[in-house]
Amino acid sequence: MVVGIGAWGPGFSDWPTLKTLLRDGVSDTPLTVANPAPQIIPANERRRAPLPVKIAVEVSWQALQQSGLAASDVACVFGSGLGDTEITDYMCRVLTTELKQLSPTKFHNSVHNAAAGYWTISSGCMKSANSIAAYHQTAGLALLEGISQCVLQQEPVLITLFDTEAHATYRQIFPCEQSFGAAILVQPMTAQPINAQSKEAKPIVLTLSNEQPAVAQVELADPYLASLAATNPAAGILGLLSLLAQSPSAQPACTSLGIGPARAISLTVEHRQ
């Protein structure tokens, strides 16, 4: 079941705000939001952390706080379809110069599991930390990995997805123009939510199919959110989040996410009164 959710993107800096947007649509006001500055990262490290890391840690911290669980007891799965294209561009350009002198800080932040490293060190996480990259299949594979681990290991798992606006050099192949991050914290159905804020905990049923399932992806009515979901790999989770945003009186609803050629997972959200 889902016991914590975090979110950040243009027009929203937390789950309650995104929840309203998913229910009511995007307003006509400019969709802006300040870059996150997760206080859980020490100040010196926070100044050096790139935007993808800040987004990932911010939404992870939001979900953890909502759950009431201790970070040391929660395993984590981080997923980013693009990685940090700003640093990728920087490293490629520097390596074409005669001296090839890379910034140690940028090189340190260039690894794909940088966000997981910042999170585990800053939060005190003592459980496993995985990082996944699969372009537009990233959201589906991260959810498959995290939910499977939750069920098989009978432990809570934080699933964090994040992707930032692609650097202009890569825009023709990665048409991602908006940054987005979201995290959901799942725990086994046998466990009881320990935080009053988690009284809206919602069970999720996951089904693996060898072919594209009969269940279609949830269509987002709002054009802005639909575009975000189509172009930002991490935002592929918006269909699932739209189901989680529904009122407790809503009927069980399904969505699907691709995890590879002719292969997908189906997710069913069951709301409790």
Annotated model-derived regions:
Residues L158-T160:
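Nucleic-acid nuclease catalytic cores
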Residues M1-F107, V111-H112, A116-S128, F162-Q273:
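Conserved "HGTGT" condensation-loop signature of ketosynthase/thiolase-family condensing enzymes
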